[in-house]
Amino acid sequence: MNSPAADQLFRGLALALPEVGEKSHFGKADFRVRNKIFAGFTADGLAYVKLTSDQQEMMCAAEPIVKPIKGGWGRQGWTQIDHAGADGSLLQSLLLTAWRNVAPKSLQKGAG
């Protein structure tokens, strides 16, 4: 669950994306592009990303460490990751997908 090394990897990958900044939401770090949240950390030490429903369904079926956040947030595509058990390529793919889901189209040209 909570791993400082995994947190650092997730944070570094998120902040490497174009125009991403780190802020706080309910006392936990989140990552935003042009003030739109696309990823962050949950209160219980997991990471989360914003996926579409189809992306979420596909990722949850393919990766046992990826699950919808419980309740209404999960039905909106918010997806938790036990990032301590994830490799960097999976995290990078999830973060890039989530970033693309919220970043303006003009910013996406040439990214990833």
Label every model-predicted segment.
Residues 1-112:
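Charge-dense, helix-prone N-terminal extensions
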